[in-house]
Amino acid sequence: MKILFINLPFSGHIIPTLGLVQELVKRNMKVTYLLTSDWKEKISYTGAEFSEYQDNKKLSVQMKNAYYAAVKLVSDYDLVIYEQFFFLGKHVAEKFNKPAVRIFTSLASNELIMQEFINADGMFGIFRSKWICRQWTKEVAKGIDLKTDCWLKEILYNPPELNLVYTVRNFQPFADDFAEENYKFLGASIYQRALNKSFIMPPKKCPLIYISLGTIVNNTISFYRKCIRAFEHENVQVIMSIGSVVNKDRLGKIPDNFSVYSFVPQLEMLENTDVFITHGGMNSITESLYYGVPMIVIPFITDQPLNAKRIEELQLGKKLMFRKITSEMIRATTLSVMKNPAIHEQVLEMKKEMRSKNANVFGANVIAEYMSKYC
């Protein structure tokens, strides 16, 4: 079987899919992953073939570049797999009468969930205006026969037959809206990744707090300083990942119980972590739950506020609002979560569910079963 995989160049939308690609390649399927050039090394590591479309700072141009590159390739493939926000993926497949599978690296979307994404800060905010959404869609999808007049509606109202979601059904809000025969919930995407030989895990001496705000919103020096003040006199060990933008020297004196890095291999960290302070991206949440780690979620954009809300609803941790946060709030909330038996009990239950399926093996099985109708 030959599979064309199409995605947009955003880390959180790509990283979970690479485990599925590895599994498909392991089964002797030929996978070509269509992405921008800066992802070539990571794609090649999976064993898939890499195919490039031109990157651009404008999302609209990225979409068009990906679409036209895919159209040139797709006739040679048996199946198209695409991530939900590349909304033209189904149209690429239909143009050449190919089956399509859609992947959700965030929560599966219905009207209420999509509205939450739009109302949050981030790149979707501009689409609160229905006129802007229609005009943007018209420009991106010129000459393509859409089912709706807005790309976000296209995600909602023009789904493919099969959808794979990287969380568990019990974490998904409005789960009953997503029919079991069409939406398969995989759990967390945990797979073999390239080793980072430059990182040496410090010996664990006491309860460990891991702090990371992901790859997009990490230029927040004031927040990192508040974390230092929160825990500098506590009997805890803190590992803080600050990204490549912030200069460590600007944080001032680093206490002895802190280790600060520009990058930390997250899965290795979570295996040893007692509480995770996170921005609440879907990957970070599913990975944390896979390792049974409760969270303090400080949401910023798009799906993160809804993810944080869900963490509190399910008693898997606590939410703090970035604009109101103080050192005392960080300290008190983190220590409270660390000692809360009800939260730990719920996290362990969710850990069992996240591990109940090997997400990428299950996903590959579902794809193989689906494609048996076409082969």
Question: Can you name each region flagged by the protein language model?
Answer:
Residues 20-22, 97, 179-182, 201, ...:
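Short, solvent-exposed amphipathic alpha-helical segments in soluble enzyme
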Residues 128-208, 213-216, 242-245:
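A nucleotide-sugar donor-handling region in carbohydrate enzymes
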